[in-house]
A protein has these predicted regions:
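Patatin-like phospholipase
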Residues: 47-142, 175-189, 230-233, 237-246
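N-terminal short beta-loop-beta anion/metal-coordinating cradle
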Residues: 41, 45, 139-140, 271
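Short, basic, helix/turn surface patches
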Residues: 106-117, 253-269, 285-287
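Intrinsically disordered, low-complexity terminal tails and inter-domain linkers enriched
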Residues: 5-44
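Residue-level marker for well-ordered alpha-helical positions
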Residues: 66, 215-216, 275
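Helix-centered, glycine/charged polyanion-binding patches within enzymatic domains
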Residues: 228-280
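Active-site-adjacent alpha/beta core region of enzyme catalytic domains
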Residues: 121-241, 280-298
């Protein structure tokens, strides 16, 4: 009887220990589940960053931006949205189409042709840069180096092109829906340098180069909800624009497009102010500025 009672005591103790272990394990599992749920909620509550790329263009200096985008393709870097000004908008079409090296060929080979940009082109077409040749003859589906329009259209990245309304001097923000098969007119509008080119007409409205109205559209990107922005400048970032080069063209332009002439006359201040703003955002960690150290004669 004594031995039996002792055995029962051991069994009771064993059952108690097992129950305690089970209860502890259950408590641990529940604690882990709660921690996981908290982590999930925390992860969901953290906003994901929205990224944008801005290329300010700048004539042949825009080859710098072309190099940046080729490198992005090599590294598999993509963005949620792209903003292009003037030649920068053309760079981005090739980038969004995934055509590595295409822009480089335009700047290093085609740009030396008389049909591309020359005094002869100005005499014949009233445009120093023959925009129809660049964005039509060369770029259409039957052109020498066509845009892969299907790839461009399939790319989910958003796209904004900036131009200046020649009539009232306001900024026009075209989007991807304004680009069609063999229709790259918004790039022509954004690249029509005042006086050097006639304004490019879209839907009855004449447009000039976007660089005279919103040359560094960082605030536009911020207002659109993008909080991580790569800004491609084509001048050293501490080099300011000067007004003197725009005074004579603005005087000529004033006779036909006074509002655009006023924009051109004040472009230097607009550019300098927008670069200063971009530097402030860079200090906050919202903007990364990429700029050449030297213009190399361009």
């Amino acid at each position: 009887m004594t031995v039996k009672a002792t055995d029962n005591g051991h069994k009771a103790t064993a059952h108690a220990d097992t129950g305690a272990r089970d209860a502890g394990a259950a408590e641990t599992v529940e604690s882990q589940r709660t921690d996981t749920q908290r982590s999930d909620v925390s992860a969901q509550s953290k906003p994901s960053h929205r990224t944008a790329l801005i290329d300010v263009g700048g004539g042949f200096r825009a080859i710098f931006g072309a190099g940046v985008m080729d490198r992005c393709q090599e590294e598999g870097i993509t963005f949620d949205h792209c903003y292009g000004v003037s030649a920068g908008s053309a760079n981005m079409v090739s980038f969004l189409a995934g055509q590595h090296g295409r822009n480089h060929k335009f700047y290093t080979e085609y740009a030396f042709r008389k049909e591309y940009a020359s005094f002869d082109s100005y005499v014949k077409h009233h445009n120093f840069a023959n925009l129809d040749y660049v964005y039509g003859t060369l770029s259409n589906h039957d052109g020498e180096y066509p845009v892969d329009y299907e790839a461009f259209a399939a790319n989910p990245t958003g796209f904004t092109v900036i131009a200046c309304n020649a009539l009232d001097g306001s900024a026009k923000y075209f989007d991807k829906s304004d680009v069609h098969y063999d229709d790259f007119n918004i790039m022509k509008a954004s690249s029509a340098v005042p006086v050097a080119c006639e304004p490019y007409v879209i839907d009855g409205v004449p447009y000039f180069d976007g660089g005279i109205v919103d040359p560094v559209p960082v605030q536009k990107a911020i207002d659109d909800g993008y909080d991580r922005i790569v800004l491609v400048l084509t001048r050293p970032k501490d080099v300011l624009r000067e007004q003197k080069r725009d005074i004579a063209p603005a005087r000529i332009l004033r006779h036909s497009y006074p509002a655009a002439a006023e924009r051109l006359l004040n472009r230097y201040a607009t550019y300098n102010d927008e670069v200063a703003l971009a530097k402030e955002y860079e200090r906050d960690g919202r903007v990364l500025i990429l700029a050449p150290d030297d213009l190399c004669g361009l």
